[in-house]
Amino acid sequence: MSLSLWQQCLARLQDELPATEFSMWIRPLQAELSDNTLALYAPNRFVLDWVRDKYLNNINGLLNDFCGTDAPLLRFEVGSKPITQVISQTVTASVSSAPAAPAARTAAPSRPSWDNAAAQPELSYRSNVNPKHTFDNFVEGKSNQLARAAARQVADNPGGAYNPLFLYGGTGLGKTHLLHAVGNGIMARKANAKVVYMHSERFVQDMVKALQNNAIEEFKRYYRSVDALLIDDIQFFANKERSQEEFFHTFNALLEGNQQIILTSDRYPKEINGVEDRLKSRFGWGLTVAIEPPELETRVAILMKKADENDIRLPGEVAFFIAKRLRSNVRELEGALNRVIANANFTGRAITIDFVREALRDLLALQEKLVTIDNIQKTVAEYYKIKVADLLSKRRSRSVARPRQMAMALAKELTNHSLPEIGDAFGGRDHTTVLHACRKIEQLREESHDIKEDFSNLIRTLSS
């Protein structure tokens, strides 16, 4: 039985699983083969339980494929494999998320190597982490499940799980909440951890002040000696060449010290214009996860949780009514609920659907005006560079059929029209055709990064 057995399994799993799943759950595993037993070591209990629940059959199936009746037994452990039994996990260059680290990268230094600790005073760190944003009050749904799971692992194992962690998605979807949740999680495990949260513009402002005050070395020392650096809206580095230069070196210093970096953006790293390619490449060294607009069930759960936090009884049918009509992001949902609560407090009236219609009259009218089937068809046609007439035609080529399915799925998601009504609007198609289109797009969003990106981009455009 070859020691490359786990490497063979990794290669097959990489082919069979979506890239994000492989990076998040399979790549962190370490393997040890001994006495006809393959031990897989997970970095924490959360990963172990998830892998055993979701991928046990896949792994056992591969072991049987490769070894037949001689397949080893499978055992799961939390921790690291014994140092004496080193089994390389590198499958291909594409599996590795970053170039090989220097041999000296073994432990996070308390200060950068160039810092003269005896000559420099102890730095004072401003955390800026909001204690109100935790994992406990983050509402999990299909749209953000992977992002939350990755953030949770980083909080449990900073510098070791996914570094850097890059979260991207539209405005108001929970990226900032997760940044703060990670910061709070790290500090809960280690009270004296040096965790710094900031908007990217603050980094730029600090650098400018340091240059003006001839204090650039102190600036470098400050940012390169944190345990975790959490930067929001990294896209604001665009076209700021001096800031990008300094962040490039800060990024490298932190990574070499096993210090955690988490970044957020409103778009995929490679799509950030005005940012150097060498930075965009580094953004993807660890794990990149999208946060999509919340689906209906998650929107309802967010409203119910927010109401509960405010000691407000929100009937389920009212939460469903609001969630069905406001779809773009969490911030919009919470803002609408705050308005409903304020109106109820001022008037003393019960929160009913009729009351919500009145309290959110202008917001609901604007939403219905913005998102119509006609508007969806025009937006999708423009996005895919085809004609609206193509969407309504009988043509079945993929270049037309896929955009048509996308438009139907968006119509179901963003409007209150029934399936037959949507079918009529697409050239008199049957409601079963619309249902098939919706299911197909949902399936492709799980399997294809491009379709997932297209759906998110179109939702963002139509909801803005």
Curated annotation (Swiss-Prot):
Annotated GO MF terms: ATP binding; ATP hydrolysis activity; DNA replication origin binding; lipid binding
GO terms (BP aspect): DNA replication initiation; regulation of DNA replication
Cellular component aspect of the GO annotation: cytoplasm; plasma membrane
Feature: compositional bias, Low complexity: 98-113
Region (Domain I, interacts with DnaA modulators) location: 1-82
Region Domain II: start-end pairs: 82-127
Protein name: Chromosomal replication initiator protein DnaA
Originating species: Serratia marcescens
